[in-house]
C-alpha cells in the first residue's frame, strides 16, 4: 500500500523547493526532515531560501510539530533567510504551520502566498532566483 503522504524536494540555484501532499504522521515528517537536510546541505555555507507548495497537504498529527520545529531551527542555524509557503487560505493549515514555523526573527522571514507566482517573485526580489517560476514542471 502506498503511503498516505508524499513529497518532492529539489534545488534550483540557492533555493530549496518542495511540494508536500497528503496527511502526515511523525514518521512522514521525519522522512521529510531527513531528505530536506540532505538536499539543503550544499546550500548551508551561504544564505539560501526555501519555497514549499502545500495546497495538497492535509495537515499532520500533533507529533509532527517537534520534528518540524527542529528542522526549522536547523535551517535557520544553517543560513536559511527566507521561506515562502504557498497554499490557498486555510485557517487550520495556517494554525498548524504557525505552531511549527516562526514568522520572523533576526535574519529570517516567512511569508504565506495564495499564488505560487507571487511567492517566486518575492524570493527573486530578494536575490533568490530559480529556473522556474511555478511548480507545474515537477507536479504529478
Place the predicted regions along the sequence by residue:
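Amphipathic, Lys/Arg-enriched alpha-helical "gate/interface" segment within cytosolic domains
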Residues: 1-140
Amino acid at each position: 500500500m502506498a503511503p498516505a503522504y508524499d513529497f518532492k524536494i529539489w534545488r534550483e540555484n540557492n533555493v530549496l523547493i518542495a511540494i508536500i501532499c497528503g496527511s502526515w504522521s511523525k514518521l512522514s515528517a521525519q522522512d521529510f526532515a531527513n531528505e530536506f537536510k540532505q538536499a539543503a546541505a550544499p546550500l548551508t555555507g551561504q544564505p539560501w531560501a526555501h519555497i514549499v507548495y502545500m495546497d495538497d497537504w492535509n495537515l499532520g498529527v500533533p507529533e509532527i510539530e517537534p520534528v518540524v520545529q527542529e528542522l526549522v531551527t536547523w535551517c535557520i542555524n544553517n543560513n536559511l533567510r527566507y521561506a515562502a509557503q504557498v497554499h490557498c487560505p486555510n485557517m487550520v493549515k495556517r494554525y498548524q504551520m504557525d505552531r511549527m514555523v516562526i514568522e520572523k526573527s533576526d535574519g529570517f522571514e516567512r511569508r504565506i502566498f495564495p499564488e505560487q507566482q507571487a511567492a517566486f517573485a518575492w524570493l527573486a526580489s530578494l536575490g533568490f532566483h530559480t529556473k522556474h517560476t511555478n511548480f507545474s514542471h515537477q507536479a504529478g
